[in-house]
A protein has these predicted regions:
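Short, well-formed alpha-helical segments that are part of the catalytic scaffolds
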Residues: 15-30
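A conserved acidic beta->alpha catalytic loop
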Residues: 25, 42-51, 94
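Acidic donor-binding/catalytic loop of UDP-sugar-dependent glycosyltransferases
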Residues: 48, 92-107, 180
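Glycine-rich, basic loop-to-helix element that forms the pyrophosphate-binding segment
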Residues: 66-82, 147-150
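Short aromatic/hydrophobic "clamp" motif used to bind/position activated sugar donors
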Residues: 87
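Conserved donor NDP-sugar-binding/catalytic core segment of glycosyltransferases
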Residues: 98-128, 200
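A recurrent flexible, glycine/aromatic-enriched loop bordering the glycosyltransferase active site
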Residues: 121-124, 138-158, 171, 177, ...
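Catalytic donor/gating beta->alpha subdomain of glycosyltransferases that bind UDP-sugars
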Residues: 167-170, 176-228
Length: 317
């Protein structure tokens, strides 16, 4: 059986710290597979990322430049220069196994799917934030999925072209929206653990986790998003309402202070607790439930802060 030519698109923006590990693994996998091309698209890096790629990875890596726009536009720009039958999107802070592209070809051939990939996992010796958040959201088995993150996603070129690529209006969440359009066209998306990648640049502290979720929230809420409102958005609104109710509960004059505190605390943690139960029902690992509850509280506070910031901007402008 003839294996397809694979075009690997790696978007880069200020990832010099992680690029050597990421590109070393990708280059080794490209050489092991044979019929593949590596396209690195620099998004205006200022930390020497582009120079690092030019000095260490040419000519095997082809470097393109893209200024401004979104990460979706960066990936689409790489695709325009690609010649492969299969497009493999791998982020610049992810490492992959040596047999990755052989496994990719096998999965596409045997699953009948038009898109595949896998979740990204934290590195060895992760921080507790990385470990708890990953265990909550990891997928236990191979199988058909609604979406796969674009940090580690592959799609048949014909399907990519048929749905029009990534939506360049979206600052974040472009992968879920793209996968939705694939499924709307009847294309299957299949996850295989053989394609698992290691993500090096996770949030490692509660503070960095909060900042990253604020950024994601600004992107998710601040751009045009076709289709239905997703569960995180609904739960963020619910959390804001319950948070306000909790504050009001403290002001109820007829209640004793212990009662007020218990009611307020219950309202504040209601949405995070519901999210935790949902993850448990979906197979998530609740090995550290109090820490998991804390992260979900931080998650909803961060998303709520992003929503409030955007509303404030709208009122001002």
């Amino acid at each position: 059986m003839t294996r397809p030519r694979v075009s690997i698109v790696v978007p880069v923006f200020n990832k010099a710290r992680f690029l050597p590990a990421a590109l070393d693994s990708i280059v080794a996998a490209v050489r092991a597979y044979g019929d593949a091309e590596l396209i690195v698209v620099d998004h205006g890096s200022t930390d020497g990322s582009r120079d690092l790629v030019a000095s260490r990875y040419q000519p095997i890596a082809r470097i393109l430049d893209w200024k401004g726009g979104t990460i979706a536009a960066v990936r689409n720009h790489g695709v325009h220069a690609a010649s492969g039958e299969v497009l493999s999107f791998i982020d610049a802070d992810c490492t992959i196994p040596l047999d990755y592209f052989g496994s990719l070809a096998d999965v596409l051939a045997t699953s009948g799917a038009m898109a595949t990939g896998a979740e990204v996992v934290p590195p060895s010796s992760p921080s507790w934030v990385e470990e708890v958040w990953y265990r909550l959201h990891r997928r236990a088995r191979d199988g058909e999925q609604e979406w796969i993150g674009s940090a580690n996603l592959a799609v048949v070129r014909a399907a990519f072209d048929a749905v029009g690529g990534f939506d360049e209006r979206l600052v974040t969440g472009e992968d879920t929206e793209f996968c939705q359009r694939l499924r709307d066209r009847g294309y299957r998306i299949y996850e295989s653990k053989r394609l698992t990648a290691v993500h090096l640049d996770n949030a490692k502290t509660v503070g960095s986790f909060y900042r990253k979720e604020v950024w994601r929230g600004l992107g998710m809420f601040g751009t045009v998003r076709p289709g239905a409102i997703d569960k995180p958005t609904v739960m963020t609104v619910v959390h804001l309402v319950l948070l306000a109710a909790g504050i009001l509960a403290l002001a109820v004059a007829g209640w004793a202070w212990p009662v007020r505190l218990v009611v307020a605390a219950g309202l504040v943690v209601a949405a995070p607790a519901a999210a935790l139960l949902y993850r448990a029902a979906a197979g998530g690992d609740l090995g550290r439930p109090l820490r998991a509850l804390l992260l979900y509280e931080v998650y909803f506070v961060a998303r709520g802060a992003a929503m409030a910031r955007l509303l404030f901007r709208g009122v001002r402008g």
